[in-house]
A protein has these predicted regions:
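Bacterial N-terminal signal peptides that target proteins for export
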Residues: 1-11
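His/acidic metal-ligating clusters that form di-metal
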Residues: 69, 73-93, 138-144, 190-204, ...
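N-terminal active-site segment of His-dependent metallophosphoesterases
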Residues: 25-116
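Short, solvent-exposed loop/turn elements at domain surfaces
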Residues: 35-37, 45-51, 79, 220-224, ...
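Extended active-site neighborhood of metal-dependent phosphoesterases/phosphodiesterases
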Residues: 108-224, 230-237, 263-271, 316-338, ...
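A short C-terminal boundary segment appended to hydrolase-like catalytic domains
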Residues: 345, 349-396
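Active-site glycine-centered loops adjacent to acidic/histidine catalytic or metal-binding residues
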Residues: 42, 101-102, 150-151, 243, ...
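Bacterial N-terminal signal peptides
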Residues: 10-20
Length: 396
């Protein structure tokens, strides 16, 4: 998809080209109250990169393992002197790592051959991220990896309008659901119900309420959020982590045509709860759906930030909705395998590091983790950064 026109956030602190420091022998100061996390998305296991660190057609297992190695090295890296939260300090504790979905590429033909089964891709992700992230939170405990599904996990589980092999593989979506929502009775690939068992979970970390949800905030997810936020103080900042951008893609909604099924003619993917209301074509803008989300955010002003993947480049922007009644701080992140810029130029590979202080001020920094492919250990740099306030206020 093309880059949307979006109002840029007012940048309080920007660091372009500030080199990350080498590992320092000086121990970090005790962490202040707040929260710090890494956000990455669209790992796309099953695909290959055209080039990576001198290799050709490098698989996602190799690339993502290299990304995780840079996450593990973060605590001993210094923030740039960019005027943002904790500028110039050692990064120190990482409270969690968030993965924004599209972990396992669809099992369709890519580059003239079938993409590996989703269950194989999922095992590689678990090895690299779930078992491979070795950073600690501010309490000294291993930092968890929080996961939301993307459209590829859902298509692998329910089917797609193009041929896939196997036709369905529910393994990743079922395991995400079980690991993240911890149901009383774990689902299996036989008992998982894609309409009933949608991923929704929350975590309270450092005075911030994080909401992690299934693909996009459709009517079902908004109903879950309404119930959840009724138990959260309105003074508590809320951060949403999901896969799709706020201006959702029409094709992800339920087919409004005929039998409302997944078919090659209509090309709707039927992964959200709502039937598409803006026409009969996947090329139509999702104006009504976006308007419903805009109204929801306006009614819940404690929702202050939104992190997403899917469109695969680093961007900090304000989403205002079709009627421009809100200003939601929104953060789009790069993909290690399908980056809009980083696929052609591996030195632009990045993820995001978010730091929130006790006053609920947040700095989000782009971390360019492969700027010198010939010397990976030295080839890191801080990129763009933005600082925003998270304290709830009226959007109007």
């Amino acid at each position: 998809m093309g880059r949307p026109r979006a109002g840029r956030l007012a940048v309080v602190a920007v660091a372009l080209g500030a080199m990350a420091s080498a590992v320092s022998p000086i121990p970090p100061s005790p962490p202040a109250p707040g929260v710090q996390f890494v956000f990455t998305s669209d790992a796309h296991y099953g695909l290959t990169r055209p080039a990576f660190r001198g290799g050709r057609n490098v698989d996602a297992h190799t690339v993502n393992a290299a990304l995780v190695a840079r996450i593990n090295a973060l605590p001993a890296t210094r923030f740039p002197n960019d005027g943002g939260i904790r500028a110039g300090e050692l990064v120190g504790p990482i409270d969690f790592v968030a993965e924004g979905g599209d972990i396992t590429n669809r099992e369709e033909v890519a580059g003239g051959q079938w993409v590996q089964p989703a269950s194989v891709s999922w095992r590689q992700f678990v090895a690299d991220y779930v078992n491979g992230v070795h950073v600690a939170d501010r309490g000294g405990h291993p930092a968890p990896v929080f996961i939301v599904p993307g459209n590829h996990e859902v298509s692998n589980a329910i089917g797609f309008y193009k041929p896939m092999h196997p036709l369905v593989d529910k393994t990743p979506l079922v395991d995400i659901f079980n690991r993240m929502t911890m149901p009383a009775v774990a689902r299996t690939t036989s008992t998982y119900d894609s309409a009933r068992d949608r991923v929704f979970f929350t975590r309270d970390v450092g005075g911030v309420h994080f909401v992690f949800l299934h693909v996009w905030p459709d009517s079902a997810m908004r109903a879950r959020m309404t119930a959840d936020l009724s138990r959260v103080a309105r003074s508590t900042p809320v951060v949403v982590v999901t896969h799709d951008q706020p201006d959702a893609e029409a094709k992800h909604f339920v087919n409004p045509n005929g039998r409302h099924d997944i078919n090659a003619r209509d090309q709707f993917e039927n992964m959200l709860a709502d039937q598409f209301a803006d026409g009969t074509s996947v090329d139509a803008p999702s104006t009504r759906e976006q308007r419903a989300l805009e109204r929801f955010v306006s009614e819940h002003p404690q929702i202050r930030a939104y992190f997403h993947g899917n469109s695969n480049w680093n961007e900090f922007y304000e989403w205002r909705g079709p009627d421009h009644t809100i200003a939601l701080h929104t953060f789009r992140v790069d993909s290690p395998m399908k980056g809009a810029a980083s696929t052609a130029d591996e030195t632009k590979l990045s993820f995001q590091v978010a730091t929130i202080d006790a006053a609920a001020v947040m700095t989000v920094r782009e971390y360019l983790w492969n700027v010198d492919p010939r010397h990976p250990a030295a080839g890191v740099r801080w990129g763009a950064a933005v600082t925003v306030a998270l304290r709830p206020y009226s959007h109007n």
